[in-house]
Structure formats: structure tokens, C-alpha cells
UniProtKB/Swiss-Prot annotation:
Catalyzes the NADH-dependent reduction of a broad spectrum of quinone substrates, generating the corresponding hydroquinones. Highly prefers NADH to NADPH as a reducing substrate. Also displays a small NADH oxidase activity. Does not exhibit nitronate monooxygenase activity; is inactive against propionate 3-nitronate, 3-nitropropionate, nitroethane, 1-nitropropane, 2-nitropropane, and the anionic forms ethylnitronate, propyl-1-nitronate, and propyl-2-nitronate. Has no azoreductase activity since it is not able to reduce the azo dye methyl red with NADH. The lineage of its organism: Bacteria, Pseudomonadati, Pseudomonadota, Gammaproteobacteria, Pseudomonadales. Pfam families: NMO. InterPro entries: Aldolase_TIM, NMO. Binds 1 FMN per subunit. This is NADH:quinone reductase.
Length: 328
């Protein structure tokens, strides 16, 4: 049993209230297994795999590396090439996966099918109204992305300090806090704000087991909290990415006005982002990173990272916070 017992740890059968959510091109077997073995809830990213058959093989590979629970992320976003979502969903179910994280567009049909097969569903969203809809659809938990997060933070620009308690005030299902988390201070803050766990992405990029080029990890460690850009705001498809030559070029095109997706499609191509992670040239394409870069200056193993987060959180609660109580 872990130090912290929450609705999240109880619902998903993990030791710590820490999740490694979906990360395109990164959520592979070695990453997920390392987090699972460390006691967190890990996910493979379905669309990192080129086909449903490849996803099934990756699930099998992950099971060779861990005997602990892990899930699969299925992101539902507009793509240049149609995605066979039903086939990916079937591969997840047939593989016996018990936890799925959905994100993006309306997950209704997928939630119903997953639940019919006994799969627990976490839906990641960026607004309380979306979380309430997911709850009505029957999800087992929601992951709430604050404005600080990497990837797609939505269009409302509400930071986690407000978004989390606003969600906790209205939701009944467990809440996972996403965006800006890297250490025990964040875990304690999230729990105090009403969350049941934290989700980390950028922090897991800078771990020993993360299957990306060392130069990308070094760039994260060297960055500060200002080293991100918000691109595609003019298209209402905002993405927070690491600031580089490509993100600046995209912003320049948007600033001229009247730009459509076709004007930036080649620059924001997912394949170029994949090459960044593989080749280590951080100016080669767009890649996701959150403001939390400013809190990252090391590259621990996942087991060390989770151990240190939980221990720091325990000490904060036992020593700092209890010590502030005036004789209560």
C-alpha cells in the first residue's frame, strides 16, 4: 500500500496517485512499464502505433515488462488521415486492457462500448462543462487539463488553481489533475484542491526510461517556465508546445491574419514532431512541452521519481502543514 490512499488508487488498483497519461510518439511499452512498475498508472498511446495490430503487439510487449496494471490512451482529434477508431477500440478490448484514457472529441460511442466490456474509462478534458458531460456518459474518472499543460489546453485559459476546485465542486467521480505537476509540492496542492491524483507528461519525458533522444531531455532540463508557445489559437485548436524555430514560424503566419490550417499543416505535422523525439533536433518540428519545464532539472528513473514525489508530499503534509496548525 502506498503512502496516499485516494479514490484514484482504490478505483484503478495502483500504489500511488500518479498517472502517466497519453503522450503521442512517447507512450510506448518501455515508458509505460517503468511507470507501472514504480506504482503509478501508466498508459500506452494507441495512435503512436501505426495500426490496431501493432497496438496489440505493443500491449503484449508491455506485459512482458510488467505484471502491474496499465492502460491505453485513445485520443479522438481531427487528423489529416482518417483513423480506424473502432478497430483500435476492438484491439484494446480484445487484449484485455482494463483501463482506457480517452481525450479530445466526444467519446460517447467509445465509452459505451468499453463499459460494455468491463473497461474503466478516464476522460481527459479542459473544462468543467466537458467533465460533467463525460460523467453523464458514465466515465469512471475525469482528467482535468489546466492552462499550464502541454498539448491541447482548450480555449478557456483557466489555470489549474481555479479549474480543479471548480471541477471538484460539481463532479462526483474521481478527478485527476493535469498540467504543471512535477514534484511532491504539486501532488499535495492537487489533493488540497480536490483532485484524487496527478497526471504528468513533460516530467516523464525527462526520465531515464523515456524512449526519446537525449538532446530532447536536455532541452527540457535547460528550459524555464516561459519556454513554451501557444500555437493555433487563431484556429481555436490551441496547442502548448516547446518554443523553437518552428513554433515561432507558425506564430508569425498566424499573426499575419487569415491563415487556415493548410497554411501551417506542413509545419505542425505529427511526423516532424516524431522526428524530433527520434533524432534530437529540437527545431525540426513541433513537440509538446508544458510550463512545468521550469521545475525540471534532472533525469531520474521512474521508480526514483515516484518515490521522491510521494516522500516529498508526505513530508510536506506531516512536517510543514501540520506544523502550521496553531494548537488545533
Amino acid at each position: 500500500m502506498g503512502v496516499f490512499r485516494t479514490r484514484f488508487t482504490e478505483t484503478f488498483g495502483v500504489e500511488h496517485p500518479i498517472m502517466q497519461g497519453g503522450m503521442q510518439w512517447v507512450g510506448r511499452a518501455e515508458m509505460a512499464a517503468a511507470v507501472a512498475n514504480a506504482g503509478g498508472l501508466a498508459t500506452l498511446s494507441a495512435l503512436t502505433q501505426p495500426s490496431p495490430e501493432a497496438l496489440a503487439a505493443e500491449i503484449a510487449r508491455c506485459r512482458e515488462l510488467t505484471d502491474r496494471p496499465f492502460g491505453v490512451n485513445l485520443t479522438l482529434l481531427p487528423t489529416q488521415k482518417p483513423v480506424p477508431y473502432a478497430e483500435y477500440r476492438a484491439a484494446i478490448i480484445e487484449a484485455g486492457i482494463r483501463v482506457v484514457e480517452t481525450a479530445g472529441n466526444d467519446p460517447g460511442e467509445h465509452i459505451a462500448e468499453f463499459r460494455r466490456h468491463g473497461v474503466k474509462v478516464i476522460h481527459k478534458c479542459t473544462a468543467v462543462r466537458h467533465a460533467l458531460k463525460a460523467e453523464r456518459l458514465g466515465v469512471d474518472a475525469v482528467s482535468i487539463d489546466g492552462f499550464e499543460c502541454a498539448g491541447h489546453p482548450g480555449e478557456d485559459d483557466i489555470p489549474g488553481l481555479v479549474l480543479l476546485p471548480a471541477a471538484a465542486n460539481r463532479l462526483r467521480v474521481p478527478i485527476i489533475a493535469s498540467g504543471g505537476f512535477a514534484d511532491g509540492r504539486g501532488l499535495v496542492a492537487a489533493l488540497a484542491l480536490g483532485a484524487d491524483a496527478i497526471n504528468m507528461g513533460t516530467r516523464f519525458l525527462a526520465t531515464r526510461e523515456c524512449p526519446i533522444h537525449p538532446a530532447v531531455k536536455a532541452a527540457i532540463r535547460a528550459a524555464d517556465e516561459r519556454s513554451t508557445d501557444l500555437i493555433m489559437r487563431s484556429l481555436r485548436n490551441t496547442a502548448r508546445v516547446a518554443r523553437n524555430a518552428i513554433s515561432q514560424e507558425v506564430l508569425a503566419i498566424e499573426a499575419r491574419g487569415g491563415a487556415g490550417y493548410a497554411d501551417i499543416a506542413a509545419l505542425v505535422s505529427g511526423q516532424r514532431g516524431r522526428q524530433v523525439y527520434q533524432q534530437g533536433d529540437t527545431d525540426l518540428g513541433i513537440w509538446s512541452a508544458g510550463m512545468v519545464q521550469g521545475l525540471i532539472d534532472d533525469e531520474p528513473a521512474c521508480a526514483e521519481l515516484l518515490r521522491d514525489i510521494v516522500e516529498q508530499a508526505r513530508q510536506l503534509v506531516r512536517q510543514r502543514l501540520e506544523g502550521m496548525l496553531a494548537g488545533v
